[in-house]
């Protein structure tokens, strides 16, 4: 198995976060109550901010990324049951947390670790809020 470079890891995260924006926007449009709308607006804001942070991080590294979007949004929106969509969204947020942890374990400098940690924290918060909503 080939070891991914830090740049490749961050590009992959950015592609996933772009898909997260699309998924959150779609879920926001389908929200049926104010609590769900507030939750999806929170997630959407977090995904947008993550895209901005990752984009700036890549620029600091001397690259711009791929411009591609992951397929996660399609998977989320293909589900018919709202709770299943939200559970998959949680899994996607957990995936991002794992990938950030893996990227940090490669030993980058604080100029990379700090923005990744900020994204991780936001995802941890959103995971908790989504789980609370499902209860």
Model-identified regions with their sequence ranges:
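Alpha-helical bundle segments that constitute or directly flank the non-heme di-iron/ferroxidase center
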Residues: 1-31, 83-107, 121
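Alpha-helical scaffold segments that form or flank carboxylate-/histidine-based iron centers
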Residues: 4-13, 32-52, 80-86, 111-124
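Long, non-catalytic architectural segments outside compact domain cores
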Residues: 12, 19, 23-26, 42, ...
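Alpha-helix boundary/capping and short turn/kink residues
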Residues: 33, 63, 106-110
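Conserved alpha-helical segments that form or flank metal/cofactor-binding pockets of metalloenzymes
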Residues: 37-69, 126-135
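Carboxylate-rich helix-loop segments that flank metal/cofactor sites and access channels
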Residues: 52-98
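A generic hydrophobic-segment detector
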Residues: 103-135
